[in-house]
Amino acid sequence: MLKIADKQFHSRLFTGTGKFANSQLMSQAIEQSGSQLATMALKRVDIHNQQDDILSPLLSAGVNLLPNTSGAKNAKDAIFAAHLAREALGTNWLKLEIHPDPKYLMPDPIETLAAAEQLVKDGFVVLPYCHADPVLCKRLEEVGCAAVMPLGAPIGSNKGLVSQDFLQIIIDQAKVPVVVDAGIGAPSHAAYAMELGADAVLVNTAIAAARDPIAMARAFKLAVEAGRLAYESGLAGKVSHAVASSPLTSFLDECLS
C-alpha cells in the first residue's frame, strides 16, 4: 500500500489524461490500468462543468484528481493556477509543473522550489515535477512536498530511465515517496523504475499513443506490479563473473574417486 499525505493507493501506476484520441478511450484505458490517481492540465479542463468529458468519467470511476500546472512559466503563474484548481475542483492535491521552454519542457528548478514552498504554506499537497537532481529533491522534501516526481527522460520522449543513476540516489535518500515521471515509454521502463525502488510511476504518452491504448494500459499495470514485487522480494546482486546455478564439482569428485 502506498501512502501519500492523506491518501492510500493500491495501485502504484499513476496516469495522465492527455493525447488520447477521445475521452471514452481515455476512460477505458485508465480503468484497465487500475490507476487511482490521474493528472490533467487545467488548460484542458472546463473546471466550471463537472460533466466535462475529462472530469466526468474520472469522477464516476472514483479516480482521484491531480490537477497540474502545465503551461505555467514561473512560480507566480503556478500559484495562481493552483488556487484556481482548488476552488473549482475541491482538491488541494497538485502536481506542480513549471517549464518555461516549450520545446524541451524542462522543469525550472528555481521557480519550482519557490512555488512549492509557498503552496505548502497555502495548504496544498504538492507533488513537484522536477529534474532528477538529488539536491533539489531533498530541498523540495524539506519545504514540505508530499512526494517528489523526478523525470526519467524528457516529457513524451519515451526514452526510459536516462537519469537512472541520479534516480537511484534520490530513491535511496528520500523520506517521501518518489514517483518517476516523464520519459517512461514501455512497460519494461516502468518495471525497472519499480525494481530500483521507486514508489510509483506516472505514465501518459506511452499509453495514449499506443496502437491499442487499452491493452497497453493493462501491460503497464502488470509491469508495475511485477517490478514492485521484484523489489520487495530482493533482487539477486550483480557479479562480474559467472556463477554456476548447478555446480558439478562435488559430483565429479565422487565419480572420479
Swiss-Prot record:
Active site: 95 (schiff-base intermediate with dxp)
Enzyme Commission number(s) of this protein: 2.8.1.10
Signal peptide boundaries: none
UniProt-listed InterPro entries: Aldolase_TIM, Thiazole_synthase_ThiG, ThiG
Keyword Cytoplasm assigned: yes
Gene3D superfamilies according to UniProt: Aldolase class I (3.20.20.70)
Record keyword Transferase present: yes
Catalyzed reaction equations: [ThiS sulfur-carrier protein]-C-terminal-Gly-aminoethanethioate + 2-iminoacetate + 1-deoxy-D-xylulose 5-phosphate = [ThiS sulfur-carrier protein]-C-terminal Gly-Gly + 2-[(2R,5Z)-2-carboxy-4-methylthiazol-5(2H)-ylidene]ethyl phosphate + 2 H2O + H(+)
GO MF: thiazole synthase activity
Superkingdom of origin: Bacteria
Binding site for 1-deoxy-D-xylulose 5-phosphate: 156, 182-183, 204-205
Pathway the protein takes part in: Cofactor biosynthesis; thiamine diphosphate biosynthesis
GO cellular component: cytoplasm
GO biological process: thiamine diphosphate biosynthetic process
Localization in the cell: Cytoplasm
Function: Catalyzes the rearrangement of 1-deoxy-D-xylulose 5-phosphate (DXP) to produce the thiazole phosphate moiety of thiamine. Sulfur is provided by the thiocarboxylate moiety of the carrier protein ThiS. In vitro, sulfur can be provided by H(2)S.
Homology family: Belongs to the ThiG family.
Quaternary structure, from the entry: Homotetramer. Forms heterodimers with either ThiH or ThiS.
Protein name: Thiazole synthase
Annotated gene: thiG
